[in-house]
Amino acid sequence: MDASELLKRYDAGETDFQGENLCGVNLSGTDLIGADFSGCDLRGANLILTYLNRANFNRANLQGAQLCGANLSQADLLGANLQDADLHGVILYAADLRGANIALANLLDSNLISADLRNVNLSGANLRGACLRGVNMRYEKRVYNGVNLRGADLHNADLRGANLTGADLSRADLTEANLNEASLREVTLTEADLSGASLQSTFLSDLIGIAVVWKQANLRDAKLERADLSDGDFTGCDLSEANLTGANLTKIKAPQAVMRRSRFNRADLSRADLRGVDLTEAVFIEAYLGRADLRNSILKDANFAKAELSSANLQGANMQGAILPDNSTYED
């Protein structure tokens, strides 16, 4: 079917185009709201600036299609193939993309607010400047796998309040992304870059974040219980009032970091580099600080009750009012 025939039928009131071969068709700038393209072959199709609100692309093949600026709000893209598609500036508000393949696609400056991205493959996708507020990427046992965002470019992306539970963000670029109040429980962030990202009040419990770059990130009030943050770079990071209970912080580097009133109960901080860090009123109950470097750190009123501190380097640290492992108070 060519473009002219399809548009003629649509203008006559027909919306059912299921299973049609529309490979390479040019439908740019047209109005196809509510059309049913489920199962269609739309490889390489030109859908630039096309109105496709509430259209049905269930299981459609849109590999390499051009969808720049298209409006796909509330569209059904369940299981669709959008690999290597150009979705620059596309509107996917509240769209259903469950199980879709969007690997290597260009989603620069796209609008994905409230979209359902469960079990989606976004590996290698470009999501720079994309708005993903309120998206659902939640991992559900026996139903949906965590979304695949390995190596994805999410620089400056808006992910406020997004549910990324169980997602794989290994080696993803999340520099300067906004993840405030998002849910990243059980996420894999190994070797990801979150420099300058904002994660205030974000849920990050049980995540795997080995060798992550957190430079200058805002993690105030973040929930990081039982997270594996080993070998991470927290240079200049703000972790004030964060909850790191039971976290693995072995060999982290945190020069110029601020961790005031943070909780490290039962955390492993062995060989952590915390030189000069502000840990005022931080709580380290039953924490392990074997060979930790706390030289010149600020530990005023910190609580080290039952902590293992015997091999830590505390040279030059300010421990005024700190509670020591034996529950005594430090005195100059």
Which role fits each region the language model picked out?
Residues 2-332:
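Tandem repeat scaffolds
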